[in-house]
Every structure is written in structure tokens, then in C-alpha cells.
């Protein structure tokens, strides 16, 4: 099986999502599967060069949201090359773009929130929660 992980960044300074991708990918590769990453990193980023997996870097993503006009066309052109898609993280452009392309092609995918829906955030950051609550119906 050929798996594509879609994530904002492969930079380990971004926290746990990339570590989760690498750990899961290690297991999947040991089982004989092929794993690539689609990210919003700049292609010349050190983290992209150092990554043990093939990284299709479509960035740099702009601002906190990470918009890149390269991500959707790349995914649209290459989606048929993969058997499974895992969107890692929410609330940013990579998840919106991946959902949009994959839904238009009627391709199923997995969404791994990496704790981003934890109720703790709702109470710890009420204004961010309100913003995300308004974004959810059309963005995710």
C-alpha cells in the first residue's frame, strides 16, 4: 500500500504531529508499505532534507494558516498515486486543501487530530475556541 501523510511541517520543533507520523511510518514501512509526506515546508528546509521519508514540500506556507497555492494542484495531480491518505492536524490550510481535493475525487482519508480537539483547549483558550468553532463548518 502507498500511504501519503499530509502535514503542515516536518520540522520537529513543531511538536508531536511529525513525531507521530515518523513513528507510524516506521511501522508501516517495516510491514512493507510505502510512505510519503506532503508538507507546507520550503523545499530547501533543513528538516525536509533530513527527513527519512520522501517529502513533497509545497511551501513555504504563508502565515499561521500556512496557505500555499502549490498544495492543491500537486495533490490533485498525484492523488491517484496513493492508496491511503492521512491528514495530520486541523485548523490550517493543509487540512482544508486536502479535504477539498480528496472529497472532490471521492477518495476516503483519515484525519488524525493529534489532540487538537481536546476539551482542555476549549476552556484554556476560549477566544481561540470561538474562532475555531466558527471555522469548523466550512473549513474542516
Segments from the language model and where they lie:
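N-terminal subdomain of nucleotide-sugar transferases
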Residues: 1-43, 49-54, 80
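Short glycine-/acidic-enriched loop or helix-start segments at secondary-structure transitions
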Residues: 15-16, 47, 95-97, 120-123
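Membrane-proximal helix-turn-helix segments that form the acceptor-binding/catalytic region
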Residues: 26, 104, 117, 129-140
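A short, charged, and often flexible helix/loop element on the N-terminal side
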Residues: 50-76, 84-87, 123-132
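Short glycine-rich, flexible loops that bind phosphorylated cofactors or substrates
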Residues: 12, 63, 92-94
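Residues at the C-termini of beta-strands that transition into short coil/loop
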Residues: 41, 58-62, 102, 113
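Structural alpha-helical scaffold elements that stabilize or flank donor/cofactor-binding regions
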Residues: 77-78, 139
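An aromatic- and histidine-rich active-site surface loop
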Residues: 84-119, 136
Amino acid at each position: 500500500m502507498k500511504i501519503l501523510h499530509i502535514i503542515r511541517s516536518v520540522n520537529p520543533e513543531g511538536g508531536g504531529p511529525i513525531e507521530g507520523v515518523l513513528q507510524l511510518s516506521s511501522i508501516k514501512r517495516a510491514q512493507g508499505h510505502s510512505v510519503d509526506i506532503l508538507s507546507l515546508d520550503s523545499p530547501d528546509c533543513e528538516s525536509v532534507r533530513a527527513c527519512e521519508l520522501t517529502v513533497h514540500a509545497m511551501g513555504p506556507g504563508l502565515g499561521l494558516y500556512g496557505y500555499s497555492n502549490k498544495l492543491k494542484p500537486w495533490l490533485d495531480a498525484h492523488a491517484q498515486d496513493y492508496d491511503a491518505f492521512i491528514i495530520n492536524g486541523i485548523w490550517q490550510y493543509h487540512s482544508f486543501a486536502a479535504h477539498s481535493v480528496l472529497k472532490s475525487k471521492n477518495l476516503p482519508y483519515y484525519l488524525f487530530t493529534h489532540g487538537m480537539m481536546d476539551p482542555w483547549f476549549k476552556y484554556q483558550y476560549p477566544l481561540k475556541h470561538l474562532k475555531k468553532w466558527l471555522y469548523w463548518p466550512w473549513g474542516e
